[in-house]
Amino acid sequence: MTSSLVGSEMCIRARCRIGRCDTAIAADINPLPLERGIETINNSGLNNRIEARLSNGLEKISGDEADDIVIAGMGGELISQIIENWEFSKDRSKHFILQPMTKSEELMRWLFANGFSVIKRDCCTAANKCYTVILAEYSGEVRTVSESDLFLYGLDPKNNSMHRRFIEGCVRRLLKQAKGNPVCAETARILEESFK
């Protein structure tokens, strides 16, 4: 199995080390981060299993080169653009592991509106910040979900402390936006109710 990664090469190294993929392609649009990634790959002894490419998103990765696509370390809107621009994104054999740093709700909105199913969702921390991780694949089923479900879908903030931490961060952000937007205020209220 081959994985392709756009963003940070850390996840791809971990997947190779634990045997989740035989080979991988790490891609970045900027030469300097790609060079640092190559150095890290070489230092970890995985240069025979991980290829690094200068690529705008998934542009330089063909459909037969990867089954699992990891896109991490950027905003949800950019992640959705990368998926939308890849000609193989609607191949039902592809799995997208997505870790948006910001605007995860916009990524969720895009996924549902464009026929992707969210198979699993969880949360993780990095640098003392909490983020969501989404496993999605193309199903062809377009869904409309409520504004609050864009934040809550697949999470259980009442029983999972990491999920709660993520939702609490979303509530804080929504309350900052609520002064000029009543939808944000109502969504924040619903999210707060989810962990009471």
Describe the role of every protein-language-model region.
Residues 1-12:
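Single conserved hydrophobic/aromatic residue that forms the stacking wall/gate
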Residues 15, 37, 50, 79-83, ...:
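Hydrophobic packing residues within well-ordered alpha-helices of enzyme cores
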Residues 22-23, 49, 95:
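Residues at the starts of beta-strands that form the adenosine-phosphate
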Residues 27, 31-66:
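S-adenosyl-L-methionine
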Residues 59-60, 65, 77-196:
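Class I S-adenosyl-L-methionine
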